[in-house]
């Protein structure tokens, strides 16, 4: 049977059991033929799997005719989609969505290379977008910087004004304080003079007269006592 399987050639629409690594023999259908120019066992068929509606490229050694292998591989299986695949291969072998999906998947499988180009194009677009965003970011950054500089200048000016303003009131307060002190001194100084004018020099023990007058009074008293002491002696001599 293996010899007949190796020599078997399939055509589009043939129903088979396809074997993939990690999966049981799965009901499938041949959708695409290998290139006619190259005929060798290395050529692979595009296979559509019933139940899962997935496609894969398999060689002839992994394909088994459905009718001949139905009893062997057509036993129920718990794998998801397997029982649905058995139903589809019996009741709807030419499912409409299968042809569209197979051709679509074929284009996706056969043309994986343009995707990097598209990715590169997206990268360029992203780069341009990033570049533009960088430029916008610079503009946005520059504007806040200017605003910060302006705000800093305003803050400095305001700080200078605040520093000057407390100094000025102090300077303004000092002259007023000096004027007040001078006024109080002027008010206090004339008081002794008025008291001296009101007081009389004849008042004994007042202590408010000037010290020179007191000294003169003491000298006069001393001279008067001396004269009184000398006077009795002179009188006695005259009597003799």
Swiss-Prot record:
SUPFAM superfamilies: Tudor/PWWP/MBT
Modified residues (Phosphoserine): 132-133, 165, 199, 202, 206, 239
Mutation effect (residue 165 to A): Abolishes secretion and alters location of the protein from inside the exosome to the exosomal surface
Glycyl lysine isopeptide (Lys-Gly) (interchain with G-Cter in SUMO2) cross-link, renumbered residues: 80
Protein name: Hepatoma-derived growth factor
Gene from which this protein is expressed: HDGF
GO biological process, one term: positive regulation of transcription by RNA polymerase II
Native species: Homo sapiens (Human)
Motif annotated as Nuclear localization signal, chain positions: 75-80
Keywords for this protein: Acetylation, Cytoplasm, Disulfide bond, DNA-binding, Growth factor, Heparin-binding, Isopeptide bond, Nucleotide-binding, Nucleus, Phosphoprotein, Repressor, Secreted, Transcription, Transcription regulation, Ubl conjugation
């Amino acid at each position: 049977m293996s010899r007949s399987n190796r020599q078997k050639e399939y055509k589009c629409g043939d129903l088979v059991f396809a074997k993939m690594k990690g999966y049981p023999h799965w009901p499938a259908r041949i959708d695409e033929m290998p290139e006619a120019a190259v005929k060798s066992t290395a050529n692979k068929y595009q296979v559509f799997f019933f139940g899962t509606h997935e496609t894969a490229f398999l060689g002839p050694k992994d394909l088994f005719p459905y009718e001949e292998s139905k009893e062997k591989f057509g036993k129920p299986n718990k794998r998801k989609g397997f029982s649905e695949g058995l139903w589809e291969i019996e009741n709807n072998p030419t499912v409409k969505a299968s042809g569209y999906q197979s051709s679509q998947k074929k284009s996706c499988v056969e043309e994986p290379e343009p995707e990097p180009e598209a990715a590169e194009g997206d990268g360029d677009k992203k780069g341009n977008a990033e570049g533009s965003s960088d430029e916008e970011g610079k503009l946005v950054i520059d504007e806040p910087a200017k605003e910060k500089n302006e705000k800093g200048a305003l803050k400095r000016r305001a700080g200078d004004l605040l520093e000057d303003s407390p100094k000025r009131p102090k300077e303004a307060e000092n002259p007023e304080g000096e004027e007040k002190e001078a006024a109080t001194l002027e008010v206090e100084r004339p008081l002794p003079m008025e008291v001296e004018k009101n007081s009389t020099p004849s008042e004994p023990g007042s202590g408010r007269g000037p010290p020179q007058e007191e000294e003169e009074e003491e000298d006069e008293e001393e001279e008067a006592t001396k004269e009184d002491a000398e006077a009795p002696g002179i009188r006695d001599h005259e009597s003799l």
